[in-house]
Amino acid sequence: MNLILKFRRSFRTLIVLLATFCLVSILISAYFLYSGYKQEMTLIETTAEAECADIKDLPYRSIELRTIKPIDTSKTDPTVLLFVESQYSQLGQDIIAILESSRFQYQMVIAPGKGDIPPLTDSGKGKYTLIIYENILKYVSMDSWNRELLEKYCIEYSVSIIGFHKANENSLPTTQLKGFPLNLFNNVALKDCSVNPQSPLLHITKGPKVEKGPLPGEDWTIFQYNHSTYQPVLLTELQSEKSLSFLSSQTLYATIIQDLGLHDGIQRVLFGNNLNFWLHKLIFIDAISFLSGKRLTLSLDRYILVDIDDIFVGKEGTRMNVKDVKALLETQNLLRTQVANFTFNLGFSGKFYHTGTEEEDEGDDLLLRSVDEFWWFPHMWSHMQPHLFHNESSLVEQMILNKEFALEHGIPINLGYAVAPHHSGVYPVHIQLYAAWKKVWGIQVTSTEEYPHLKPARYRKGFIHNSIMVLPRQTCGLFTHTIFYKEYPGGPQELDKSIKGGELFLTILLNPISIFMTHLSNYGNDRLGLYTFVNLANFVHSWTNLKLQTLPPVQLAHKYFELFPEQKDPLWQNPCDDKRHKDIWSREKTCDHLPKFLVIGPQKTGTTALYLFLLMHPSIISNLPSPKTFEEVQFFNGNNYHKGIEWYMDFFPTPSNITSDFLFEKSANYFHSEEAPKRAASLVPKAKIITILIDPSDRAYSWYQHQRSHEDPAALRFNFYEVITTGHWAPPDLKTLQRRCLVPGWYAVHIERWLAYFSTSQLLIIDGQQLRSDPATVMDEVQKFLGVTPHYNYSEALTFDPQKGFWCQLLEGGKTKCLGKSKGRKYPPMDSESRTFLSSYYRDHNVELSKLLHRLGQPLPSWLRQELQKVR
């Protein structure tokens, strides 16, 4: 009994002691939490006067420079994984615009509220080098399983995260970011933004400097923290203490912070708003560079060329006088202090010399007396648009007049650059313009804003046609009517906004090479051209580490294609699909001469038979024959493509009814061409695609026999088995023959390439065996696929010729029209050794084809079913 009483007393004593200990612990924790928070508040207190001081002297404990774990870029592909709120969210679109302008590869996915994240690795390598969340809350609120997977991937593959937090009316005034020692204060109005010059992520951005004035909007988020992993990147002040009463307006607050990865091993950069504020765009680009280990980074070199079009052109009152020309010369010298080798590039139309007022004519004369101070390029003599000239000789006459004017007045004629008025004839290509340019001026370079389209500007590219390098041209907000500052469209503040962090600044920021289009009228009156580029150069110099420089046009073009060699080959489009393109395309030309469907091959599968069957239909019309490649144009897969769309369209007759008539072409080399799908989709995106498949082993053997019949030296020297089994040591002609035998049979690979550019509804796959045995049924299927009318009865129009061994067209009087002697040749059967080898060689390809056909909902041809049975 006493033992029980003692135990009860001891138990009560233990309970009291535990309760006392818990209470003391709570009091101590509360004290330190409170003092820690107060300490943090004190730590970030400073004044605006300190904003340009050494950041080490600022009272930020977290600003102490710390060692950051280097990013290992070898474990991942240089691709960004972007989680967006929706496909059309504004911030998501702004992020994509910067990624695309910077030419960074990315994959966009909708951020899952619940559910799995996309696969992050492939064959042991990370698929993404950086992860961006449009809404960082989607990241922190992930379920524990997926968040653990994501963070494990980030740690193992040295991957970082960028996140944005955009407060809204439903945001709490204060929030703690789940899983982080980080407090967020939402819906704050801010002003006077400065860059932390000690931030390790700065690359393009220069600090310290202050952007005075209120920041756009009152929905900003500021970050507070009490951990050494965080470092401020962008600092701001409160507009007033009304935002959050417990925050001081005499304090600098971080609206972008960098997480050095000291907390959990993952580096991050967090933004307290979207990208509407221009400095956020600048820091965002630097954050991508830093967090990707410089794999996704922009060079600091920027090449700019300022063209002044329409020299001597313009009505009275809009041209340059003597004072304007002197200002042009003075400003050119001023700009050279910030832009190495800066020189204005003047485009002249000699016909309009001395057509202004007396003062303006004197300005013309001073320009010509200063001819050696500038670079010069020819416009058209009469400022006519080249596409309005339908023959080369007329263009040559105009150019000769301008050239004679240049020679008379000492204007250099050998700079190799020209620009067409309104970019006419450059793209869409007017072949007469390119020929005349080369003949008269020896032009090597031109520029246009129209390729592939005017907007969005970030998609503009260069290309080379007829040995003339075409560079993308940029607008700068100055047009022929933009003469007076106060009358600038939308008000002068719009021009200033474009210069100071807006569209014009971003053009410089995101493009390594920029050719700006301006006009003579922009340098008279209020001289907005001078105002724009002086202020732009000052702004770029003040806020960035970019190195501005100018190169002559030909050197600039070579530099451009050194940077972007993949752009050398053009990608032709239908001029009638873009109103601007149609407006600068000759009215004598038509878009009706383009095919509605393509028979793409592959070779030796029955494409010629299908071609002849199609021609039997009264509404189906093929291309005209080529003198070199017979019934095949072979446009999309080879050098013919560089002859341009006019060359291609000349092969097609004018349809009597563009609605009911179906133009088509058959080129069997298209099937396995790497270029053809992309090129075809660009020019005829709505075209339907027909391909024929037979056993790839039979196709390979048929090609070999075809080459023997055409006396291919390699086919005559080596038997079929030697061809298909030859190794890397083989002579070039044998390797070429082997590729032509084997590679077209990779059916799934090639079809997937076409499906990357055309929808499944645009593709018809024909069973080659069925086409040979039952063509009428196949042709009924083809007619249905094309939607062609009237329905043509092939059962009555085709007859089997036992002597030929295939189906022929039945003519009046019982006569037949069959394929030529070269078709349907009888070859010795394939040897069993080759058959066995090819069956093994194509096994995986056939399995992939079966998966593809299943996905497309198409039946498996009999030959494929037989081959798959061998796999089992």
Curated annotation (Swiss-Prot):
Any Pfam family: HSNSD-CE
Entries under InterPro entries matching the protein: Heparan_SO4_deacetylase_dom, HSNSD_N, NST/OST, P-loop_NTPase, Sulfotransferase_dom
Name the record gives this protein: Bifunctional heparan sulfate N-deacetylase/N-sulfotransferase 4
Reactions it catalyzes: alpha-D-glucosaminyl-[heparan sulfate](n) + 3'-phosphoadenylyl sulfate = N-sulfo-alpha-D-glucosaminyl-[heparan sulfate](n) + adenosine 3',5'-bisphosphate + 2 H(+)
Function: Essential bifunctional enzyme that catalyzes both the N-deacetylation and the N-sulfation of glucosamine (GlcNAc) of the glycosaminoglycan in heparan sulfate. Modifies the GlcNAc-GlcA disaccharide repeating sugar backbone to make N-sulfated heparosan, a prerequisite substrate for later modifications in heparin biosynthesis. Has low deacetylase activity but high sulfotransferase activity.
Keywords on record: Disulfide bond, Glycoprotein, Golgi apparatus, Hydrolase, Membrane, Multifunctional enzyme, Signal-anchor, Transferase, Transmembrane, Transmembrane helix
Organism: Mus musculus
Record's GO cellular component terms: Golgi membrane
Further information: The presence of 4 different heparan sulfate N-deacetylase/N-sulfotransferase enzymes in mammals, as well as differences in their enzyme activity suggest that some initiate heparan sulfate modification/sulfation reactions, whereas other later on fill in or extend already modified heparan sulfate sequences.
